[in-house]
Amino acid sequence: MQIFVKTLTGKTITLEVEFSDTIDNVKAKIQDKEGIPPDQQRLIFAGKQLEDGRTLADYNIQKESTLHLVLRLRGGMQIFVKTLTGKTITLEVESSDTIDNVKAKIQDKEGIPPDQQRLIFAGKQLEDGRTLADYNIQKESTLHLVLRLRGGMQIFVKTLTGKTITLEVESSDTIDNVKAKIQDKEGIPPDQQRLIFAGKQLEDGRTLADYNIQKESTLHLVLRLRGGMQIFVKTLTGKTITLEVESSDTIDNVKAKIQDKEGIPPDQQRLIFAGKQLEDGRTLADYNIQKESTLHLVLRLRGGMQIFVKTLTGKTITLEVESSDTIDNVKAKIQDKEGIPPDQQRLIFAGKQLEDGRTLADYNIQKESTLHLVLRLRGGL
C-alpha cells in the first residue's frame, strides 16, 4: 500500500509500505528517499508520536494515510562531562540519546574509544543501551567520566573453525561488552554469539569476574545458526511437543507454533520456564532459553467469565474471557467469531474507547458486562 509523509516544509513523500512494517522500517525508507538519518526523525500520526518497534497496523495506519515528519533538532540540551583530570567537556544531546550515543560524542571530541569510557551519574554507572531520559539526566546535568585502563587483561576467544581472537578486556566487562568487541573484530552480531567457558554458557548481563575469567583465559564461541535449535514444551497431561525455534523468536511466535501443532489458541496458553510465566513480547534469548530447554504449558481454562459485545446492527456476541485478557485478546476472539480484523474494531465500555494493551480488569469489566463494537471503515478517516 502507499502512505504519505508530510514534512514541515510542506513537501509530501510517497512510500510503498505494508501493514506489518515497523516504524523503524518506515524511517529507513525515508532515509533512502531523503537522506535524513532515522535518529533525527519523529513521525506523528493522529497526534501521537510513533514508537520505533511498533507496526503501522498497531497504529491503524491504512492506505493513503498521511504521517507528519518532524525533525529532532540537534542540540535539544547541553550536558557536561567531567573527567578525573578535572577537565569539563560540553555536549549537545537529546533526552532520547542512548549512553552509546553520548560515548560516541565524547569520542568525537576527545578521541577516547567508547569501550574505554565508563560514565557515572548520581553514583550509578550508566548502561550503554539506556537513554539519558531513563536516568532522568536533564539539561546542564554533569556526568563523570572514568577511563577503563587499556590492558586490564587479555583473553582469547576460540571459534569452531579453530581461529583464535585476542581481546583486551577488564574483569568488570559484561558478556554483552565482550560480544560487542567480537562484533567489532569479526562482524558477528551479538545475538548470533554464544560464549562458553568451563562448559557453561555465559549470560549477557554478567561480568567476566562473575565467571572467574582471568587473564589469558580462553572462551569458546559457538554461533547460533538461524533456526538452529529445538526446544520442548511439556503439557499438564505429560505430552511433550518438540518445536524448531530461534533465540530471537518471541513468546508470541512460540505460542503460534504450538497452535499450529496442537490447535490451542495462543490466548489459552501460558508458558512457564524456570518457574516464571513468559511474556508475549519477550524473546527466548531474553529468558536465556537455550537448545533442548523444556517449557511447561498451562492452559487458561475457558469460562473465567462471559461478557457480551453488542454491534451497531444490534447483534450481541457472547465471549468467554478472563479478567487478565487484554483488549487485543478480546478483539482476536471477536475476529474468530465474526471474521472482523482487529484493526477494524473499536470497543467502547462505559463511554470510553478501550486501548489494546490494557486488560479487562484495568477497565473494571466484570462478568456479563456489555461492550459496544464500532467498526472502523476501511479507507475511512
UniProtKB/Swiss-Prot annotation:
Function field: Ubiquitin exists either covalently attached to another protein, or free (unanchored). When covalently bound, it is conjugated to target proteins via an isopeptide bond either as a monomer (monoubiquitin), a polymer linked via different Lys residues of the ubiquitin (polyubiquitin chains) or a linear polymer linked via the initiator Met of the ubiquitin (linear polyubiquitin chains).
Protein name, entry field: Polyubiquitin 3
Family, similarity comment: Belongs to the ubiquitin family.
Gene: UBQ3
GO cellular component: cytoplasm; nucleus
Classification via PROSITE patterns: UBIQUITIN_1, UBIQUITIN_2
Domain named Ubiquitin-like: residues: 1-76, 77-152, 153-228, 229-304, 305-380
Prosequence residues removed at maturation: 381
GO biological process, one term: modification-dependent protein catabolic process
PANTHER family linked: UBIQUITIN
Pfam families: ubiquitin (PF00240)
Covalent link Glycyl lysine isopeptide (Gly-Lys) (interchain with K-? in acceptor proteins), residues: 76
Glycyl lysine isopeptide (Lys-Gly) (interchain with G-Cter in ubiquitin) cross-link, chain position(s): 48, 63
Nucleus listed as a keyword: yes
Other facts: Ubiquitin is generally synthesized as a polyubiquitin precursor with tandem head to tail repeats. Often, there is one to three additional amino acids after the last repeat, removed in the mature protein. Alternatively, ubiquitin extension protein is synthesized as a single copy of ubiquitin fused to a ribosomal protein (either eL40 or eS31) or to an ubiquitin-related protein (either RUB1 or RUB2). Following translation, extension protein is cleaved from ubiquitin.
Keyword set, alphabetical order: Cytoplasm, Isopeptide bond, Nucleus, Repeat, Ubl conjugation, Ubl conjugation pathway
Gene Ontology molecular function, alphabetical: mRNA binding; protein tag activity; ubiquitin protein ligase binding
Family annotation (InterPro entries): Ubiquitin-like_dom, Ubiquitin-like_domsf, Ubiquitin_CS, Ubiquitin_dom, Ubiquitin_ubiquitin-like
